[in-house]
Amino acid sequence: MNISKKALLIGLIIISCIVIIFFNYSNNIKSEKNHDKIFVESNDQANLKEISFFNLDQEEFFLSDFNGKVLLVNLWATWCAPCRVEMPSLDRLEDILGDESFQVIAIAVEKTDISKIAEFYQEEGIENLKIFHDKSTKSGLYAKAAGLPFTLLINKEGKEVGRKNGPWEWDSEEVLEIINELKEIN
């Protein structure tokens, strides 16, 4: 191989490395910007109304049972450390804003017995959230999750308006403002 071919090959390798570094750097910047958002806007309008889950008495509920309410639907598990950390803020959010027009629905998605979830609520002093469970973990919501905790914000018409992967302080001023704005929309 002559010198000009070697120089060309080395040049292509250097340019390829620069391109790879640039794309990795720009993707990191984008993910940091998204991480700073509370909710990532979603255009996913899959039918959420038929998503089912159970309460402590093993009664089946569907998201459509809550039509007319703004919902903050949180998927979590007792074994998930970030989920356990954010549960008190979800409980406070339900205490602050929970009424006929808004509800936090925290659905434990795990194969454990629902009594273990009730024990967790008692140990952590969770008083305002109702106990909901999806033991099958086959919920359509679970399929949307990139991991736990996973939270959807749903408007009164039952349409997803935003989602959050990962934990958050759900009783923060920013969240209260967003939910209050949605509650006011007819």
Question: What residue spans do the PLM features occupy?
Answer:
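Active-site acidic short loop of glycosyltransferases
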Residues: F66-K69, D99, I126-N128, A145
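Residue-level recognition of specific faces of alpha-helices
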Residues: W79, E86-S89, F150
